[in-house]
Regions:
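Residues that define the transmembrane beta-barrel architecture of outer-membrane proteins
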Residues: 18, 42-48, 55-57, 90-94, ...
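Outer-membrane beta-barrel "beta-signal"
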Residues: 19, 162-169, 189-201
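Transmembrane beta-strands of outer-membrane beta-barrel pores
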Residues: 26-30, 56-58, 65-69, 116-120, ...
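Transmembrane beta-barrel domains of outer membrane proteins
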Residues: 51-55, 99-102, 160-164, 172, ...
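Flexible, solvent-exposed loop segments that connect beta-strands
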Residues: 31-42, 69-92, 120-151, 182-186
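Repeated loop/turn-to-beta-strand initiation elements of outer-membrane beta-barrel proteins
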Residues: 20, 57-61, 107-110, 167-173
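Sec-dependent N-terminal signal peptides
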Residues: 3-13
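Start-of-domain marker
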Residues: 18-68
Length: 201
């Protein structure tokens, strides 16, 4: 993590001192699962975003960190036995984006473009509970970790808008619609809603 942060600081230093925007805030992420997902509850997972941006010509380019994920719940009952499974998946990405901004009012700007994500690492925690069986009743917790080699290059649409409180400080709401699968052989895509503060240097 320290190396990643140093890389971001280095890239930030490469940007001109004027015109740099620092953005940071909260993510609410979930996933689109194209496989059979009957009886599977797919819920939002909290995360964070932290990145820097700068304008080059008519476009804005940014680099930073995004944490995505999902919460999954499933319960199956048969012959008096109930099996409940609750899972949390967290995925960390180094992201790059390019957007085209359009000012619709003096303080309001909307934008659209693309975002790429290179996987850093991830983790899944799964809690399984069995009840009604008697002998096999109980709860177990398992976890699994992934590194960058396990994760596919992510890409998708990046849309949003900025509201400037003053010349330096503003609020951003954005949406990432993943168009690529998160792992090889898995038809699952990330979707993220973000609310962030931005600061113009």
């Amino acid at each position: 993590m320290k190396i990643i942060l140093l890389n971001i600081l280095f890239i930030s230093a490469m940007f001109a001192q004027s015109g740099l925007t620092v953005v940071g805030g909260l993510n609410q992420s979930k996933q689109t699962i194209e496989e059979d997902a009957d009886d599977l509850d797919i819920n939002y997972m909290n995360g964070y975003n932290l990145y820097v941006e700068r304008s080059f010509g008519v476009a804005r380019f940014g680099v930073g960190l995004n944490q995505r994920g999902v919460k999954l719940n499933q319960e199956v009952s048969d012959m008096g036995v109930t099996v409940s499974v609750a899972g949390e998946q967290t995925l960390n990405y180094l992201t790059l984006h390019a957007v085209y901004p359009y000012a619709i009012q003096e303080k309001i700007t909307v934008f659209g473009g693309i975002q790429l994500g290179n996987g850093i690492n991830g983790e899944a925690k799964i809690k399984q509970s069995i009840s009604g069986s008697g002998l096999f009743d109980g709860t177990s917790v398992d976890s699994e970790e992934w590194d960058a080699e396990d994760m596919e290059l992510e890409y998708g649409l990046f849309l949003g808008g900025d509201y400037m409180i003053n010349e330096k400080i503003g609020v951003r709401a954005s949406y990432f619609k993943g168009l690529s699968d998160i792992f090889e052989g898995v038809t699952t895509k990330n979707n993220t809603i973000s609310v962030s503060l931005l600061f113009n240097i």
